[in-house]
Amino acid sequence: MAFKKDKPVYIVDTTLRDGEQTAGVVFANNEKIRIAQMLDEIGIDQLEVGIPTMGGDEKETVAKIAKLGLKASIMAWNRAVVKDVQESLECGVDAVAISISTSDIHIEHKLKKTRQWVLDSMTEAVRFAKKEGVYVSVNAEDASRTDMNFLIEFARCAKQAGADRLRFCDTVGFLDPFKTYEMVKAIKDAVDIEIEMHTHNDFGMATANALAGVKAGAKFVGVTVNGLGERAGNAALEEVVMALKYVYKMDLGIDTSRFREISEYVALASGRPLPPSKAIVGKNVFAHESGIHVDGALKNPYTYEVFDPQEVGLERQIVIGKHSGTAALINKFKEYGRVLTEEEANLLLPHVRKMAIQLKRPLFDKELMYLYEDVIVKGKAKAI
C-alpha cells in the first residue's frame, strides 16, 4: 500500500472496528459494506474494517469489503499474534494493524508479562506480516500512560522489524493537547517512523489531542464517524477533517458535503442518534435565534459561522423564538413571500416572545402565521 506523497495528513477511519466496539453497537453485514463504500466515495485514505480472528460474519464481511475494489487501503485489526495476522491475510486486506499494550499497568495486570515479551511478540508479528508484503501499523496500546523511554524503544523496535507506522493510542483519553504534543514530538525526534494519532474522548479532548499530534509531526489520524467508540468515543471524522481544513489550513481533498448524510446513516445503523448540537454535523450547528446573531448572520454569514453549512451537507436555519429580533422576523416572512415592515415586526415581536415562553420552544411556521393573522391582519382590520 502506497499513500499519495502530496497529502499533509492521511485519514484512517475505524468506524467499522473501534466504532462498532461502542457498548451496545452492532452493524449488520450490509451496513458495514455500505459504510465502507460511503467513506471510500468521499476520499478516506484507509479503512480499518474489523477483526478477522473473530471468525464468522466478522471475517466474512472483512473479506467482502477487501474484494470491493475500493480506492482506500483496507486494514484489519490484530493482536500481536501470528495467527491473527494469518486470519487477516486470508481476507485479502492490504494492511494490518498489530496491537499490543505498552504501559506497565497493562503489561503487568492485563497481559501478566514483561516489557521484553511485548517487544518480542510485536517484532515476531510485524516480521511475519512484512514477509507477506502488507502495510503494517503497530499499535502502542495505552501509549499515553507508557514510560517515555520504553515507548521510544518500542517505536524503534517496530521500525527495525519493518513496521510502516506507529499508532500512538491514547487508549483511555488521558492526555491533554500539550502533553500529546510533547510525547509525539519526542518519538518523532528519536525514531524515523510515521505516527498515527488514535485518541479517545474521555475528557472531551479527542479531536484537540489528534490535532496536537499532527502539530508534533503525526501524518495519520484515526477517526470514527460521529466519534463512535469505546466509552466516550474517538476523535470524530467530521471534526478532525474540518478542523484541519480551517484551523491548520490543510485541505485533504475529502468530499465533506456528504458528512451529514454519512453521519445520519451511521447514527441510524448504530442506534446512536445525533445530538442537535453535535459539532460540525448537528442540526443546530447553523441554527441562529438570538437577535444580534441573526442580524449579523443575515448581513454576512461569516460573522457567526466559520464555513458555509452546505460544505458539510447542512443548511442555515433562522429560528424564531424568545431571543429573536426584528431582523429575523422580517427575513422569515421574506421566506414566506411576504413583506413585513419594520413597524409590523416591532408590533409582532412581543407576541412571538410571549408564545415562545409559553410553549418553551421556538415557533413553528404555522404558529408564526397564526400570530401574524391575529396581530397584524386582524389588527389592521379593526383599525379600519
Swiss-Prot record:
It is found in: Cytoplasm. GO terms for biological process: L-leucine biosynthetic process. GO terms for molecular function: 2-isopropylmalate synthase activity; metal ion binding. The keyword Ribonucleoprotein does not apply. Its EC number is 2.3.3.13. Keywords: Amino-acid biosynthesis, Branched-chain amino acid biosynthesis, Cytoplasm, Leucine biosynthesis, Manganese, Metal-binding, Transferase. Its cofactor is Mn(2+). Signal peptide: none annotated. Homodimer. Belongs to the alpha-IPM synthase/homocitrate synthase family. LeuA type 1 subfamily. This is 2-isopropylmalate synthase 2. It comes from Caldanaerobacter subterraneus subsp. tengcongensis (strain DSM 15242 / JCM 11007 / NBRC 100824 / MB4) (Thermoanaerobacter tengcongensis). The lineage of its organism: Bacteria, Bacillati, Bacillota, Clostridia, Thermoanaerobacterales.
